[in-house]
Amino acid sequence: IGAQTYACPVYEKVGFVRTDYAYIEDGIPHVRMIQELA
């Protein structure tokens, strides 16, 4: 997913990990995240 950087801690609590550098989308900082499925 492309998560807004301020929301990353929420996604990390449910198993997502950051995979890339921050980027700007629509004027808002985002970071790419993935969640591996077991």
Q: Can you describe what each PLM-predicted range is?
A:
Residues 1:
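Aromatic-lined ligand-binding clefts that engage carbohydrates, nucleic acids, or primary amines
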Residues 11, 16:
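Conserved active-site tyrosine of GNAT-family acetyltransferases
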